[in-house]
Amino acid sequence: MSLVQGHGTSGLFTEPPNPINQQESSGPSLPAQDAAQAFASSPRAGATSTIVNPPKRKYKGAVVVQRATLSISAVLDNGQCVEIKYHSNLASALTNLCNTNLYDLPACLNRPITAHNLPALIEEAAAPYSLICYYQRGTVRRVEFQAEVPLLSFPLKFLVKQGKVFLIKDISQMQKCEFCGSFFKVTHTCALRRRDFYFHHVAAHSADWWEKISFTPIGAPPNTERLFIVYDVETYTWHGKFGKQLVPFMLVFQLLGDDHLVNVAKTLATEQNWEIWNGKEQDTLYYCITPEKRAIGVKFKKFRDTLQQHIAASLWSHVICQNPQLQEKATTLGLESPEELTPDQLKKFKLKGNPRFIEVYAVGHNITGFDEILLAAQVVSTRAEIPPVFEICRNFMPRAGRLLFNDITYSLPNPSYVPAKSYEHWEQGQVLASDLKSQYIKFMVRDTFSLTHTSLKNAAKAYSLTVSKGCCPYQAVNEFYMLGSYQQDADGFPDLKYWKDQEEYSFNKDLWIKEKKGAYDIIQQTLDYCALDVQVTAQLVNKLIESYQIFIKNSVNLPETSFNVFQRPTISSNSHAIFKQILYKAEKPNTHHLSTILMAPSNEMYEYVRLSIRGGRCYPTYIGVLQEPVFVYDICGMYASALTHPFPAGSPLNPYERALAIKAYEQKMLNHKTISYFDKDLLPGIFTIDADPPAEEFLDVLPPFCSRKGGRLCWTNEPLRGEIATSIDVITLHNRGWKVTLIPDTRTTVFPEWKCLAREYVQLNISAKEEADKSKNQTMRSIAKLLSNALYGSFATKLDNKKTVFSDQIESNIAKEIASGAYVVKSSSYIETDNLCAEIMPEFVVAYPPVNSDVRQLAPPSCSEEDPTKDPLAEAPFMHNFSMTSYHYKPIMFIDAEDDDFCLHTLEKSTPLIANNRYPSQIASFVLAWTRAFVSEWSQFLYENDAGTPLENRVLKSVYGDTDSLFTTMEGYKLMEEKGKKRLKKNGGKLVFDPSNPELTWLVECETQCEKCGSDAYSSESVYLAPKLYALKDTTCPKCHHVGKGKLRAKGHATSTLSYDVLKACYYADMQQGSDVFKTSRMSLRRTLTSVQAHVQPFTVTETTLTRKLRPWKDKTLHALDMHRLIPYSRKHPNPRNTETTWMELQWMT
């Protein structure tokens, strides 16, 4: 028994037994206050009492009294870190403060205090010093007040936080950890995870530097319906105000795909009076011929628009049949039909049924650089009669004179959509119907050239097609449409000058004679030629779909994937998708992105990483005619071999761990003359560096690094200042004798580990290529070679802040961004004006007299109607004989259309920073760094023995260096056979990096080989004029003494008119200051998509003649050692273009 105090004055009484307080430990217990109340009213001892069970509490848990004083840590507006302690109860705190200082609470402070009226109340209270601290997201903005006539003797300090006002008790100084953001007074210990989180998600300067890369499996829903419209056009030259413009006069197309979609398209083609080629409907080849300008585009647009409408109606009918309740929903909303629902309204309803996924492709060869541009002004419009219930998304992207994207998607909600929780099927490349939020109809433009990178003629051979491309006398067709006739031979066949050569002329004439079709019909022959091109392209489409599906199934080992190579527009985008799929399968991140395995630099970091991407070398070190043997060596699959090496992986280190990693590099460079690229103590990184070269006599003509400081990319032996370089380049420079200093830079990036991210991708492509060689499968060999070479380019993709939109695509969010200045309109282009209904007002001239102060009265406008005989000039206004001003009005076209129908805008972000969540650009930087390591090792084979000898006294060993090749003299050839034999492919060796035995892995082979015996051969004489402008006279075999043909390269010139002798004569004419001028001319097609130039019409292809002068290198980026030899710039021979000032801190002055 225990004694308890009663609430009255009666003293103590015994507490009766309370079974409630003796429950099991798992049951709730009464708090002390409730127990006291329960027994305060109970009878005293001896009295009969009844125990009443108290009501159960609604909430369980500990009851915590609110603290009287709270605190926050923040950074003041002057950068000082502080801790602010404040009272949680403003009213009582103010009262206590005033009472402590022997004041009553001022009436003004007794009113409700808010963040808005606080400044006025402070001025009314008139404290000698007052302070308001406005707190927001870790920072404090201070506003101070000082009363001229104080009414109080103590200061007032307030804190405004989340719209509430508090009284500050104390402000004390603090310190802030720069690595994890924690505040502390004396000492502090932070955790690794907190440091990483702060750096990547909290710190204002670095939180947006790295983005996770989204992932989508490479497959497509297995029940996807597809239709391919394979087409080709033929053009003639039309001379207009914009020059020689190419105008289509013929279009042929063939239909492939699912039968029901093909039948719909065939019915539409018949209804719209498309002619059937050769009268064979089963071939599904249709054509139209008309020389009328833009008529072909209008007819093809009508066909594509009508097809869109039919397929959209089919999909909507499918949805309505499965969801009849939509009619009732529409009626409830006051709509006549469910079609009038908006996409947002439809998303609110729960749909039922099976989704449909429909894809329609317009396919051709080289159409994104030619055909689609000619037709774009007619076919790019989205103004088809599509029900408004569809959500429309357009991806229109012109780039480098080509239509990279021209896709339209009409989507509806997918009733089967379920957010993915398990990603095992993603690892196998599968996309299920439940993975997609929308069912859709996609209309896409695809170019087989972008997937094969070769001409249609070569593609037919490379992919083993049963038909081949024909020949057409284009110029004869041009003259026929321009002049009405063309030159013919005695048999009425187009003259020899219209054909490529005598062989082509004879071959096609023989075919024509054998066909015995009578007189040569140039239009019919052109139609047959165009139809044959379409047939070849159609076979190529089927071959690509089938072959890539087999490649993904067997070589990539994804047997369940439904892969469609046309789902992505280019071979580069397909290679990148396959790479990500292989990486996703290997790493199993179990999410919708690649996690932290591989991240993309963004905003400020994107620019920093891009600065570390340095292109390949390409320059001659000898100018003129060289009359001694030259061998050409080429690195075998340079980018593919580089891609098998380790690359940076993981989320970049925070500044603390980064500093430790940098220290490891500095210690290694200080203590070791040579560092291994595969030292486990060194992590991958991108640094800002200074580098000083060794003494002049220890340099060579193959520098390990290049610089853009002079305005042009230049391989130089000069000191490097403030360059952005990878850790591989740091090691390369150090091993070549350069003194490298890592400069402190907040953007310096170090990654936590090395990984062979692309090794499996390259390995499977090499294996597929070798297997194809064994089985003589030319198609698989072509696919494997293309995919192997294309991956590097996808990593190096350069993004910009521009996008092209149509007026009808500018939605409210884009309009707000333009209004706020986030986007600016760089240019606007107008198209289709020739096809819209228009009323033209002819040219007219109006003469106006100058203002005359004597004219006071105007004649009534109807005076001539009242009296036709009265002279209207008898009264004012009338024309005097003094000088007048004439205004000439040009014809005015009034177009019956809205600007949204034909206005195209190019928008650009106002910020120079580029957001990137797609491409890991650091991989491209490291790929090039590995190739520089290859060439650095190569240079050691040739020049290691020359160390200490001045450059002018050395034997000539190499004369030209390209990205992946080197031209050596006989002396250089001997050194390769002796010191570089390990790297010669003919001696065996690996092309794929082996992680278990890490070493640089690359091979070279002699490109100049004897065409008879296959031995290494040389060119007995060669001439070098400039980068990418050289010629080898022949290929001489030292074994069998066979002399084969040479090699010529002249980038930008018409090589058909050049030869070794022409280049040689050009060099001698320039050296002897002769009067001969050497030029080359070739036809060039100028492609214009969007333009702000008045003399250029958007969406046109114009034909121009490009003439270039042939001459030796004038603006050299090397120093001339003598009349022929060139050497890189150095301290002794600095680059004259370098005008940039570099500020350095001299140690002896600090």
Swiss-Prot record:
Task: List the source organism.
Answer: Canine adenovirus serotype 2 (strain Toronto A 26-61)
This protein's superkingdom?
A: Viruses
Listed GO MF terms:
3'-5' exonuclease activity; DNA binding; DNA-directed DNA polymerase activity; nucleotide binding
A single Gene Ontology CC term: host cell nucleus
Asked if the record carries the keyword Nucleotidyltransferase, the reply is: yes
Q: Which family does it belong to?
A: Belongs to the DNA polymerase type-B family.
The protein's name is DNA polymerase
The record's PANTHER family line, in alphabetical order, gives: DNA POLYMERASE, DNA-DIRECTED DNA POLYMERASE
Record EC number: 2.7.7.7
What SUPFAM superfamilies has UniProt attached to this entry?
Answer: DNA/RNA polymerases (SSF56672), Ribonuclease H-like (SSF53098)
**Could you say which enzyme class this protein belongs to?**
transferase
Q: Which GO terms describe its biological process?
A: DNA-templated DNA replication; viral DNA genome replication
